[in-house]
């Protein structure tokens, strides 16, 4: 109202201004000019029907019928205009005051059910209908009554027809978890006021159609963040909502059940530990399983075409263990495999938690597994070395191959040894060598030289690439010669003993491949080849010996018997590579080597080196003399 009055005063002043401009005391305006003035000044406050009323009033104001309105007539017209304006303003102020109660009730109802309103499929969000003034008094009451009783909302007959045509089941009829709340059956109304001239008021209703609550508690409450899914039951496709707990419910569950959560965490940690243990157990089992399977395949490939009695009892120490491991691998139950698979799936989910602990446990088990695996293989290698000290025995190479195949860790120690092809040996030599093997094993049982063979083999592995580059053509003889030289750099006090031991080992392997091959004639071998090969081998040995003297400050302790034995071995190996010798020459060379070695051991550095071809000594007697000399040398070194 104050704004309207200010607008009226502005109009009066403008009217007076126009009148002054016209000149004279009587200022006049036409009806058109006055209407334009009123619309421009106070048209924002007035409705269009007010201006129609002003035109009728202006016709009455033109008393003199001259078509102009004087200032006095204008003042009367203005105050006559204020009557309908005041009436409209009073209606605008009074009608919201009447509807405020219902609006407050609707606001309360909407706040109560705001989180649970779900629109029904097929029902429009808004519906318009006519409400007469008799219905206005009761417009705010049905929602309140429906909120208390929970009955079906009041709608017109037309809306009843539309509602009955819709599916009445919003959710699945057999869901025992949820119920429809009472506040869902609400009618939200917003009344737009109309003037008294119209006589009819328009009411815009936002109706949320919710079916009547069924007697059986089988309805489910639709909630936010829920996933819609469809089910087909009793030939009716209905939409239902899968309930998810809200944040309040999750908070209450966490506050009410702390003991259950602690129990769940404890069980989760136990499951994680079990998964870690199962995974490490499985990894250790697979590592133990794969090696024996490969070993058995290699041993089967090597044993093809051989007699069962050829293998001595010392070389079969690892086979029962490998067979037991293979049987264990094939005997794993299916349930344990499934359990390991499930444990791996659990472990992948808890990898960030158990990664550190699982690595530590796996490393510990792997180290223990290597320690257990290497302990029997070291014993087997020691026994193989003891058996190799006897010259002429043909089973040591077979035992060495079997032990290398059964333990991949001992493969490094055996890679520098020469690969000697086994030929057929007569039955008499086999029986003779077997008896000497047993005798040698009993004598050398407590000898310190047998204990250091493994260390010698590891020492020889480090310098193997240098020897291969210098002697690619005759690598077998080079490896046999360089072993005592490399051992001389390791320990000064044990040089003579170890050189003799390695000489015996190399000599043990030489007669195995000196048997004559079928289809080749001995006349094809030329004797001048022997001095050339022996000279080349001796020259190379001199270079290697010179290198060992530079590394060892005390050359007096370098074994002279080792030098003579290496020279003789070079001669025999050169004969072996260039061709085949008759059995007589082979036996004489072998006897010469034994006699030279024994004479060098007993007589000192000045003893003769050349072998005597006239002597014919039995192989076992030479072996016994050689072992006695070796024992005497080892006692002197100690």
UniProtKB/Swiss-Prot annotation:
Coiled coil: none annotated. Pfam families: S_100 (PF01023). Residues 49-84 form the EF-hand domain. Residues 134-638 are annotated as: Disordered. InterPro entries: EF-hand-dom_pair, EF_hand_dom, S-100_dom, S100_Ca-bd_sub, TCHHL1. Residues 166-179, 343-357 have a biased composition (Polar residues). Residues 221-246, 294-309, 318-328, 358-372, 395-409, 419-435, 479-490, 526-548, 622-631 have a biased composition (Basic and acidic residues). GO terms for molecular function: calcium ion binding; transition metal ion binding. Disulfide bonds: none annotated. Belongs to the S-100 family. This is Trichohyalin-like protein 1. The gene is Tchhl1.
